[in-house]
Design a protein with these regions (language model features):
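Short acidic, low-complexity segments enriched in Ser/Thr/Gly/Pro
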Residues: 212-215, 219-222
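N-terminal cap/lid subdomain of alpha/beta-hydrolase-fold enzymes
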Residues: 176-185
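Generic, ordered loop/turn and secondary-structure boundary motif
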Residues: 170, 189, 194-197, 261, ...
Length: 325
């Protein structure tokens, strides 16, 4: 009896300077999810196909609560202290002296929980349209070209960090109680595949998208956000005009920010923009997960998970086949 899921189709090609197809991406994400957060779970009759269960078992009230055991490649159900009956046949199974059937388990994993779904979790902010693998692949390919995330190792590190940041590609919005600690407050909490946070980062990305230069007006002190800066200079006659311009644009930025959690284009593009802006391509080239994580997260929060996800993205993308290694 197999206690693992049927293996998904694996890819053997190198992804350097190559677009993902929808099938490529689905296969990679499925493989990663199958290997993520796996724990063995006992199986019960309630989760077994009813038409495969012998009527012998169904005559008992609450028969679905019975755990399933395995003995010599046969699934069996225990009655009393020592009696076991075949799950499929309902006939008694003779257990040899000194032997004991064991619980039948299946691995629960991220794939068991999420399947092939993408960014489907019901959060305060979610994608306005259901996401397909075709669209997700298109957006990733465009971002990879635009921001030079163009080799296997760069893409592996990028996707592994995104996988953690988005809770396994289920949401592009940070549901958290710590939002008050971000500069600018809850309007500027984490959004996107790599969670963009703080008002000054949103302003910088707004400038990048709209080809504006409002961030140059923000001459901050250490630890000071844009909103804090506006408050500080509002009474300064020489900076009053700057304060007014920043105040007006930050209202636009506040409205724009939600695009990063509701529109997959901005969710992907903002992450890739952040990646290149912070020279993460060059860091990823060194294959140093810790260094990448510190740059993304500002510390080592979740480092063991980031290391593990990087490892399994390498396996899923068959990094051993990479032509640029």
């Amino acid at each position: 009896l197999k206690n693992i899921m049927e293996p998904s189709t694996k890819t053997t090609k190198c992804f350097c300077h190559t677009d993902f197809t929808a099938d490529d991406l689905r296969s990679i994400i499925r493989t990663v999810r199958e290997k993520s957060n796996t724990v063995p779970q006992k199986q019960f009759l309630s989760s077994y196909p009813s038409d495969k269960i012998a009527n012998f078992h169904k005559k008992y009230a609450n028969y679905g609560a019975n755990p399933i055991y395995t003995y010599k490649n046969e699934l069996v159900i225990k009655y009393g202290a020592t009696d076991y009956y075949s799950l499929a046949k309902g006939t008694k199974v003779n257990v040899a002296q000194g032997e004991t059937p064991v619980f039948w388990t299946k691995n629960k994993s991220d794939y068991t929980v999420y399947g092939d779904n993408l960014f489907h979790n019901n959060t305060n902010e979610k994608l306005l349209r259901p996401l397909t693998y075709e669209v997700f692949a298109k957006e990733l390919n465009e971002a990879f070209r635009k921001y030079e995330i163009n080799t296997c190792v760069r893409r592996i590190h990028f996707l592994a960090q995104c996988y953690l940041e988005t809770w396994r590609f289920t949401k592009a919005y940070e549901d958290t109680t710590k939002a008050a600690g971000y500069k600018g407050g809850a309007d500027f909490l984490g959004r996107g595949l790599i969670h963009l946070t703080n008002d000054y980062n949103y302003l910088a990305y707004y400038d990048a998208v709209n080809a504006t230069t409002y961030a140059k007006l923000y001459k901050n002190r250490i630890g000071e956000g844009v909103i804090d800066y506006i408050r500080r200079i509002s009474g300064d006659a020489t900076l009053k005009a700057d304060a007014q311009k920043l105040l007006e644009v930050m209202e636009k930025v506040r409205a724009f920010a939600k695009n990063l959690s509701t529109d997959i284009h901005y969710a992907v593009d903002s992450a890739a923009w952040f990646w290149k802006k912070n020279k993460l391509n060059e860091i990823a080239d060194t294959d140093d997960v810790r260094a990448v994580s510190v740059k993304v997260n500002g510390g080592t929060n979740g480092l063991p998970e980031r290391e593990y996800y990087t490892k399994i993205f390498k396996e899923a993308m068959r990094y051993n086949n990479c032509k640029s290694k």
